C-alpha cells in the first residue's frame, strides 16, 4: 500500500497546473461578482466577457467622432452673438481695421453660413469637442446601467439616424431648422421621460409583443443586412458600394481622387448655377472611373479575410484581430492607406492623434435644455417622431440582440427585459441632459455577442473602455472606416441565421418577413422596416380577421370540412357564408 502511494506521488506533483486565465476564470466565476452576473449559469467566463466587450467597443468606437461631427453641424448652442466683427477689407485683421475707406462690419445671421465667420467656426469646434465628451459620458452611463440592472451584453450610445434627424431636420444646419438646439434637447428629454414611464409600467414590453412573430424574427436578419450595407459603403465601411445616378447603387471601390460629391442645384435663365434651397452637398459618394483601385478598399478586404478565416477556424477574438491589423497599418503616414492624408483635414486629424491623451470639459452642451418653444407645433412634431422611432427602433434592436444571443423564450420574453427597457429609457434622459441626441442599444452589440458575451460584464467592459476614451479619444477617434467595415459585414452574415425560423411556405408569414428585411437596409432605417413588415402583416390578415369577427358575432357559421396539413389553420372555404 505504501509503495502504491509512493508511486502515485510523482504523478500528483508533476500534474500541470491550470493556466493563469483558467484560474482567473474559476476564481471570478465562484466569486460574488461571478454569481451576481451569472457567469456559470450562462455558460460564460470572465475573460470571454472582457473579449466580447472589447470587440463591441472597437466596432462602435466610430460613434465618438461621427456623432460629434453630425450634431455639431447643427451649430449647437452657437449663435450670431458668437460671430465677431470683420473688416470691410477681408485681407485686414479686425484689430487693424483703421484708415480711410475701412470699417468694421457687424455680423448678422449670414455669419453662420459660407463663408463662416471665424468666431462662429471657433464656437462650433468647441461644441464638437463638447459633444465627443457628451457622447462618451452618455454611452458610459448607459452601459453601466444596462450591465448592472439588466445583466445583458448590450452596449448603448447615441443612435445613428436619430442624430442625423436631430441635426439636419429638427435643428437644421447651423440652426437653420424649425427649432433651436436647446429646444430640441428639451424634446428629447420629455420623450425620454415618456419612454421611461411606459417602460416602468410594463407597457413597452406589451407593445413589443404586439409585433407579429414573423416581423420579430426577420428583424434580426434585416438588421444584419443593414449592418452589412453600412460596412460596404465608403463613409463607414470598405467602400465597395457607391452611388449611381441610374441604378442608385453600384460597384465602387475607387480611390479618393476618383470620387466626387453631389448636390441638388438649380440653373437660372442667365446660366447661373446655385444650390437648391434646403439642399446640402453630399460626401464623395460617386466614382467617375469604374476601376477598383482604392488602396483602402483592398486593405479592408485583407481585414475581411483575416476575420473570416479566424471565424472559419473558430479563433476567439476574430473581430479584434481584423480591426487592430487594419487600424495599425492605417496609422502610418505618407502611405496610400493612411488615415491621415496630406491635407489640412488630415494634418488636423494627425495633430489630434499625436496628442494621445486629451481631457476636455463640457462647457456648452450640458444642461442646455430650453422649454421656451414647447408651445410650437414643430416641437411636438419632433417629440412624437423621436418617440415612435425609439419605440420601434430600439425595441426591435433589443429583441433582435436578445434573440441573437439565444435569450428569447417561446413566449417572446427574455431575462432582464424589464430592466433593459428601463436602462434604455434612462440613457435617453441622461443623454439629453449632457447635450446629445437619443441614446439607444447599438446593433454593434452583436459583435460582442458573437465573441461569446452573455452577461452584463460585457456592457461593463464597454463602459470601462468609454471611461478610458475620456482620456484617449485621439486614438479611438482615429480608427478608420475601412477597419470597421469588415466586422460589420461579417456580423451581418451571422445575423442572417434567423431566417431559418420563418415559414417560407406560408405567404402570410413570408411576405411580411421579407418586407421587414428588405426595407431596413434600403431605407436606412430599422423603424421603417418594422412599419412595413407590420403593415403588410395586417393587410394580409385583415380578411381572415374580418371573417373571424363575423363568426363570433353570429353573422357567419363555421363548418369545419378539412384541415390544412401544413399549418392546421381553417381555410377561408371552410366558413359557411350563410347568415
Swiss-Prot record:
This is Adenine/guanine permease AZG1. One of its GO terms (molecular function) is purine nucleobase transmembrane transporter activity. GO terms for cellular component: cytosol; membrane. Keywords: Membrane, Transmembrane, Transmembrane helix, Transport. Disruption phenotype: Resistance to 8-azaadenine and 8-azaguanine but not to other toxic nucleobase analogs. Deficiency in the uptake of adenine and guanine. InterPro entries: Azg-like (IPR045018), NCS2 (IPR006043). The keyword Transport applies. It is a multi-pass membrane protein. Belongs to the nucleobase:cation symporter-2 (NCS2) (TC 2.A.40) family. Azg-like subfamily. Transports natural purines (adenine and guanine) as well as purine analogs. Confers sensitivity to 8-azaadenine and 8-azaguanine (8-azg). It is found in: Membrane. One of its GO terms (biological process) is guanine transport. The chain crosses the membrane at residues 52-72, 131-151, 183-203, 221-241, 260-280, 292-312, 320-340, 379-399, 414-434, 459-479, 480-500, 514-534.
Amino acid at each position: 500500500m505504501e509503495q502504491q502511494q509512493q508511486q502515485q506521488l510523482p504523478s500528483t506533483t508533476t500534474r500541470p497546473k491550470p493556466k493563469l486565465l483558467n484560474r482567473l476564470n474559476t476564481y471570478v466565476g465562484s466569486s460574488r461578482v461571478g454569481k451576481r452576473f451569472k457567469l456559470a449559469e450562462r455558460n460564460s467566463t470572465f475573460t470571454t466577457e472582457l473579449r466580447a466587450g472589447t470587440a463591441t467597443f472597437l466596432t462602435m468606437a466610430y460613434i465618438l467622432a461621427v456623432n460629434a461631427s453630425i450634431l455639431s453641424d447643427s451649430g449647437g448652442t452657437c449663435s450670431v452673438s458668437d460671430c465677431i466683427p470683420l473688416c470691410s477689407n477681408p485681407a485686414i485683421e479686425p484689430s487693424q481695421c483703421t484708415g480711410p475707406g475701412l470699417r468694421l462690419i457687424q455680423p448678422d445671421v449670414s455669419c453662420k453660413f459660407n463663408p463662416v465667420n471665424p468666431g462662429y467656426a471657433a464656437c462650433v469646434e468647441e461644441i464638437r469637442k463638447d459633444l465627443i465628451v457628451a457622447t462618451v459620458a452618455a454611452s458610459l452611463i448607459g452601459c453601466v446601467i444596462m450591465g448592472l440592472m439588466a445583466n445583458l451584453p448590450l452596449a448603448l450610445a447615441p443612435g445613428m439616424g436619430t442624430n442625423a434627424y436631430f441635426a439636419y431636420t429638427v435643428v437644421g444646419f447651423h440652426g437653420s431648422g424649425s427649432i433651436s438646439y436647446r429646444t430640441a434637447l428639451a424634446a428629447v428629454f420629455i420623450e425620454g421621460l415618456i419612454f421611461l414611464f411606459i417602460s416602468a409600467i410594463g407597457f413597452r414590453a406589451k407593445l413589443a409583443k404586439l409585433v407579429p412573430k414573423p416581423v420579430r424574427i426577420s428583424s434580426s436578419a434585416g438588421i444584419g443586412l443593414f449592418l452589412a450595407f453600412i460596412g460596404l459603403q465608403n463613409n463607414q465601411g470598405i467602400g465597395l458600394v457607391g452611388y449611381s445616378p441610374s441604378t442608385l447603387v453600384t460597384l465602387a471601390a475607387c480611390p479618393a481622387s476618383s470620387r466626387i460629391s453631389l448636390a441638388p442645384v438649380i440653373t437660372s435663365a442667365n446660366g447661373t448655377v446655385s444650390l437648391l434651397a434646403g439642399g446640402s452637398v453630399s460626401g464623395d459618394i460617386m466614382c467617375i472611373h469604374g476601376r477598383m483601385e482604392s488602396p483602402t478598399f483592398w486593405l479592408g478586404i485583407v481585414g475581411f479575410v483575416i476575420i473570416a478565416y479566424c471565424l472559419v477556424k473558430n479563433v476567439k477574438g476574430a473581430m479584434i484581430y481584423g480591426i487592430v491589423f487594419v487600424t495599425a497599418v492605417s496609422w502610418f503616414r505618407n502611405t496610400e492607406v493612411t488615415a491621415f492624408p496630406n491635407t489640412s483635414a488630415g494634418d488636423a486629424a494627425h495633430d489630434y492623434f499625436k496628442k494621445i491623451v486629451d481631457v476636455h470639459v463640457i462647457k456648452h452642451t450640458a444642461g442646455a435644455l430650453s422649454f421656451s418653444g414647447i408651445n410650437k407645433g414643430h416641437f411636438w412634431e419632433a417629440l412624437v417622431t423621436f418617440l415612435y422611432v425609439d419605440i420601434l427602433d430600439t425595441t426591435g434592436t433589443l429583441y433582435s440582440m436578445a434573440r441573437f444571443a439565444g435569450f428569447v423564450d417561446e413566449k417572446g420574453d427574455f431575462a432582464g427585459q424589464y430592466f433593459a427597457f428601463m436602462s434604455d429609457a434612462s440613457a435617453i434622459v441622461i443623454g439629453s441632459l449632457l447635450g446629445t441626441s437619443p441614446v439607444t442599444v447599438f446593433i454593434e452589440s452583436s459583435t460582442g455577442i458573437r465573441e461569446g458575451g452573455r452577461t452584463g460584464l460585457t456592457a461593463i467592459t464597454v463602459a470601462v473602455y468609454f471611461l478610458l476614451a475620456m482620456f484617449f479619444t485621439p486614438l479611438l477617434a482615429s480608427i478608420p472606416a475601412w477597419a470597421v467595415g469588415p466586422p460589420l459585414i461579417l456580423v451581418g452574415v451571422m445575423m442572417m441565421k434567423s431566417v431559418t425560423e420563418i415559414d417560407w411556405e406560408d405567404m402570410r408569414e413570408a411576405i411580411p418577413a421579407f418586407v421587414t428585411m428588405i426595407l431596413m437596409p434600403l431605407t436606412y432605417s430599422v423603424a421603417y422596416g418594422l412599419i412595413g413588415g407590420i403593415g403588410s402583416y395586417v393587410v394580409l390578415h385583415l380578411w381572415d380577421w374580418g371573417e373571424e369577427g363575423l363568426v363570433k358575432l353570429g353573422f357567419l357559421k363555421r363548418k369545419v370540412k378539412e384541415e390544412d396539413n401544413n399549418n392546421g389553420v381553417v381555410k377561408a372555404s371552410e366558413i359557411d357564408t350563410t347568415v
